[in-house]
């Protein structure tokens, strides 16, 4: 199979077994590619996790450690995923077989991409619905004047009402597929550019407002001033691992969502330079989210936390005590809605492109088939907080959403990242020479030759550590038998990945 033609054409299979060639749509602008890719990377973890773990782990000292891991972990994986996309000119459905060595089995990994995308969206669409629902509640004033217990109760009431959550989940699904059905340039690129521009404006305005609140300076100190005592109290090891894992998970690499945008990318710029821009934008959003949340918490004497309770209980209480709180609360949840929907749109585009590349279906046909399927697929996560609350799949207190998050965050993202890295460095995959040549095409910083050893041996080892530590942290408190069983399962998955990656027919 010829290599490199995929960046110009895609195969669209028709009923008689033949195919026609059609020019593949590209991004209309460099800015469009950067903002759409950053929209995929910018997720809820940037807001409900990063500011808290940053403050708890030593402030600016943690940020420096985090930036190091973004450079040595997130950057090369993102480069690998983008380059596979641009080099093949296809999504994950055809990318591996377009570039792999004859007789290898890399093309089987396409299923990791599509399965990961579906499982991620099975709960992410629900959470995007939460953001839209709270934006509406803040705008309508229905949260204004509530006491703290009532605000907490409002979130609990929402979780107990499958009808409410289903309606808003459906709104998120329809909005996102509505963007995707318009196409790459007229839909995904055009609308995501507007959303990301508004997101960046909102986040700056909200951050400035928080910084001028009374006593906000104490929050800034907690968040940004290096605190070596905090690092000593936690231990350097846990701090480093928190930085490493967040750097790994923040960029949404591993399930092909970045790969598909690489397939729409022109060759006038190097992959490394574009990856740096996206990482910087993602980091900017994460840091600015902290300047919104932490100073506001200190200004009103509220302990900053993490997770959904921070967004849906702590912050609404703060807005209720703030002058113009209804306006600021609405602006915040509109910002969060944009952050969530930009990710949903990006992953939906990956799903759509999978079927277009694999079967030659039209975009409209793929969207029509997936709208109903995605709504049905998202229902278990919705019901897991009410009708199916007694089903606790990964231990006491867990929910169906926790299971889906575990499958994606602790399995498909790290294993998918491993696949892309190995594919770009192993001879029976694409190979280092082909990968580096494609990545360095165009203007911008080039990937150096010395990176080969690091990406071939050290980076896979780091990914294995992140992967196994994720399993350990998830199951360490659930009993030795539980932990050992799941750790064995994790190792079996790793062996399967390496087995397929190293397979090659002797006569090939």
Predicted regions and their residues:
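Membrane-embedded translocation segments of transport machinery
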Residues: 22-27, 189, 193-341, 345, ...
